């Protein structure tokens, strides 16, 4: 998003369906995924519910609260969510069309993997949106997790011929170390796949950007006698835990996420999150 914004093109983020308990509130009072709000900031525009028309907020392993175009629309279990695929796609297409009328370019983000073969029938955020928007696709692989060659080549192998034709390039994300150490890897991927590797993005530490799904344990600090020690109870489905980032960054405050009784022994403040 930021890269396109810096070229002077008006751009907006879009993710048709997101699953996260970390939500952001737009100026109009609607809820969207925290990631889309951050991406909107990178685009230099205000966030809007059309950037994330379907937000699923899990309340158990098998059910979720359903937020559609910013408003809560009840809750559904997993099987009922699959039954609503056509409805979700229609809502996503409506939001995308409105958003497309306001900007020159839209960056579509998928969900999960691009090759979830067991979920093709209920896919909302990936290939249905690519087809609707007639979009070109960048396949982004996270090398920091390991297995990047299997990620890229395995994904391409599982795509249909038409899906594969949509892919214009591969981007390797979160690369640590010297770029020249991956030249051989780039060559291998290009020869094996026939698709160019358009970029290798370095791992950037210390960005302090809000996480959407994974709790950022790096924001925790060690309790001491000279700090105000805050323990946040680590609940299984804690929502909006990024709200604690500002507190963790405050001078004189130490914050930890606690899930054992002994973790609370030195705490001056205990917070039970929502």
Regions found by a protein language model. Give the residues of each.
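Flexible phosphate-sensing "switch/lid" loops adjacent to ATP/NTP-binding sites
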Residues: 1-274
